[in-house]
């Protein structure tokens, strides 16, 4: 009877197993089976497939095409190019006058275009000038970049009902610098104006004489000045519109020999730049001394006119000068 009780107690204390075990071997077997069971459970849990999350089907968004824009250098607002063209390149937020190409300026100024003058002239390279690249190569790059053959464009046409000759510098073309072709075109513009007794209007924007042509460039200052004098003697009006910027040999010649000088707001006008003058005289100069408004206050120019009023202002002045 005792033996049976011992058998029952031993059977109840032993773990369930397929084979009989006893003593320390039983404890080790229990630990191994428990560890195996836990390892098997963990592996099976990790190997379970991750359920997919149900998502609402949304339409695929594509990139929205935006119109090219330009940042205003004054107020840093972004303006679409269409809005700039419609507003004559004047910022609608701060009224800053942005740069225009010569052709855009003239086509917006004239009501009717009859002919373009000076296309037969082409630049030569008599000095075989080389800076960072040969002069002919630089000219080719500028022509490709701007779509123009030179820094001055001359158009003959009408402003309202008045026959005029108008020319404009393109600052993109080597800084609007004046070389022999620019001089040739301006002289031809003056001669056509003289022949047709039509007023001459010049929109100036230049860094000065073109260094790549040396003394030939400087000679254009004398040629253009002589052509303007012939207009004056014949009583033909010559109006200069000073845009931003006008410097150097252009300021010292054709840009300051007009019967009337008009400037756009905040245009920079001078012979040498502020830094060069300060280094020469060794003095700190007043900041706005080359601004159009400062020059107007000191009697250097006659008017500062907003770009939107430029056409009407020039026409009224010409009507008075020609007694129309």
Swiss-Prot record:
<keyword id="KW-0863">Zinc-finger</keyword>
<comment type="similarity">
    <text>Belongs to the AccD/PCCB family.</text>
</comment>
<keyword id="KW-0479">Metal-binding</keyword>
<keyword id="KW-0963">Cytoplasm</keyword>
<dbReference type="GO" id="GO:2001295">
    <property type="term" value="P:malonyl-CoA biosynthetic process"/>
</dbReference>
<feature type="binding site">
    <location>
        <position position="94"/>
    </location>
    <ligand>
        <name>Zn(2+)</name>
    </ligand>
</feature>
<dbReference type="InterPro" id="IPR011762">
    <property type="entry name" value="COA_CT_N"/>
</dbReference>
<comment type="pathway">
    <text>Lipid metabolism; malonyl-CoA biosynthesis; malonyl-CoA from acetyl-CoA: step 1/1.</text>
</comment>
<comment type="subunit">
    <text>Acetyl-CoA carboxylase is a heterohexamer composed of biotin carboxyl carrier protein (AccB), biotin carboxylase (AccC) and two subunits each of ACCase subunit alpha (AccA) and ACCase subunit beta (AccD).</text>
</comment>
<feature type="compositionally biased region" description="Low complexity">
    <location>
        <begin position="1"/>
        <end position="16"/>
    </location>
</feature>
<feature type="compositionally biased region" description="Basic and acidic residues">
    <location>
        <begin position="22"/>
        <end position="35"/>
    </location>
</feature>
<feature type="domain" description="CoA carboxyltransferase N-terminal">
    <location>
        <begin position="68"/>
        <end position="324"/>
    </location>
</feature>
<feature type="binding site">
    <location>
        <position position="75"/>
    </location>
    <ligand>
        <name>Zn(2+)</name>
    </ligand>
</feature>
<keyword id="KW-0862">Zinc</keyword>
<feature type="compositionally biased region" description="Polar residues">
    <location>
        <begin position="36"/>
        <end position="45"/>
    </location>
</feature>
<feature type="binding site">
    <location>
        <position position="91"/>
    </location>
    <ligand>
        <name>Zn(2+)</name>
    </ligand>
</feature>
<keyword id="KW-0547">Nucleotide-binding</keyword>
<feature type="zinc finger region" description="C4-type">
    <location>
        <begin position="72"/>
        <end position="94"/>
    </location>
</feature>
<feature type="binding site">
    <location>
        <position position="72"/>
    </location>
    <ligand>
        <name>Zn(2+)</name>
    </ligand>
</feature>
<dbReference type="InterPro" id="IPR000438">
    <property type="entry name" value="Acetyl_CoA_COase_Trfase_b_su"/>
</dbReference>
<keyword id="KW-0443">Lipid metabolism</keyword>
<comment type="function">
    <text>Component of the acetyl coenzyme A carboxylase (ACC) complex. Biotin carboxylase (BC) catalyzes the carboxylation of biotin on its carrier protein (BCCP) and then the CO(2) group is transferred by the transcarboxylase to acetyl-CoA to form malonyl-CoA.</text>
</comment>
<keyword id="KW-0276">Fatty acid metabolism</keyword>
<keyword id="KW-0067">ATP-binding</keyword>
<dbReference type="GO" id="GO:0008270">
    <property type="term" value="F:zinc ion binding"/>
</dbReference>
<dbReference type="GO" id="GO:0006633">
    <property type="term" value="P:fatty acid biosynthetic process"/>
</dbReference>
<dbReference type="Pfam" id="PF01039">
    <property type="entry name" value="Carboxyl_trans"/>
</dbReference>
<dbReference type="InterPro" id="IPR029045">
    <property type="entry name" value="ClpP/crotonase-like_dom_sf"/>
</dbReference>
<dbReference type="GO" id="GO:0016743">
    <property type="term" value="F:carboxyl- or carbamoyltransferase activity"/>
</dbReference>
<keyword id="KW-0444">Lipid biosynthesis</keyword>
<dbReference type="GO" id="GO:0009329">
    <property type="term" value="C:acetate CoA-transferase complex"/>
</dbReference>
<dbReference type="GO" id="GO:0005524">
    <property type="term" value="F:ATP binding"/>
</dbReference>
<keyword id="KW-0275">Fatty acid biosynthesis</keyword>
<keyword id="KW-0808">Transferase</keyword>
<feature type="region of interest" description="Disordered">
    <location>
        <begin position="1"/>
        <end position="51"/>
    </location>
</feature>
<dbReference type="InterPro" id="IPR034733">
    <property type="entry name" value="AcCoA_carboxyl_beta"/>
</dbReference>
<protein>
    <recommendedName>
        <fullName>Acetyl-coenzyme A carboxylase carboxyl transferase subunit beta</fullName>
        <ecNumber>2.1.3.15</ecNumber>
    </recommendedName>
</protein>
<dbReference type="GO" id="GO:0003989">
    <property type="term" value="F:acetyl-CoA carboxylase activity"/>
</dbReference>
